[in-house]
Amino acid sequence: MKTFSAKGNEVKRDWFVVDASEKVLGRLATEIARRLRGKHKAEYTPHVDTGDYIIVTNAEKVVVTGRKFKNKMYHHHTGFPGGIKSASFEKLQDKNPTKIIELAVKGMLPKNPLGREMYRKLKVYAGSEHPHTAQQPKQLEIEE
């Protein structure tokens, strides 16, 4: 019996919608990353993108445990000398709530071209509305 290896053009990709309301950020992000990679499928192949499309709604209502709401910091560099910028979870959630989930999931995906391809299948929206109704996404429940 030969080992099965999935081919990129033969993989069936489904669309799922996840409601992030009152979900813990890390637990939500790990399940999303797992689904984007395709590890939940029997035909998972490490060097092929076998994952599904994930739509995350209500990103503004995601929660963190402990004191991370005030103390967790996000950093980025502008590219100019002395250009390190920092923002707390609280400020980033007010300014750009989708960025929090995007950064959490992106850090859990491979850091290579295949990981970037997987990341493109993630769609995050701050509110409960999304423009992907034509894809008929299924509701995905993520337990706490």
UniProtKB/Swiss-Prot annotation:
GO cellular component: cytosolic large ribosomal subunit
KW Secreted (keyword) present: no
Native source organism of the sequence: Legionella pneumophila (strain Corby)
NCBIfam families registered for this protein in UniProt: rplM_bact (TIGR01066)
GO molecular function, one term: structural constituent of ribosome
Gene3D superfamilies listed in its UniProt record: Ribosomal protein L13
Example GO BP: negative regulation of translation
Oligomeric and partner information: Part of the 50S ribosomal subunit.
Highest taxon listed in the record's lineage: Bacteria
Family (UniProt): Belongs to the universal ribosomal protein uL13 family.
Keywords: Ribonucleoprotein, Ribosomal protein
Presence of the UniProt keyword tRNA-binding in the record: no
Descriptive protein name: Large ribosomal subunit protein uL13
One Pfam family hit: Ribosomal_L13
Function: This protein is one of the early assembly proteins of the 50S ribosomal subunit, although it is not seen to bind rRNA by itself. It is important during the early stages of 50S assembly.
InterPro entries found in the cross-reference section: Ribosomal_uL13, Ribosomal_uL13_bac-type, Ribosomal_uL13_CS, Ribosomal_uL13_sf
Transmembrane segment boundaries: none
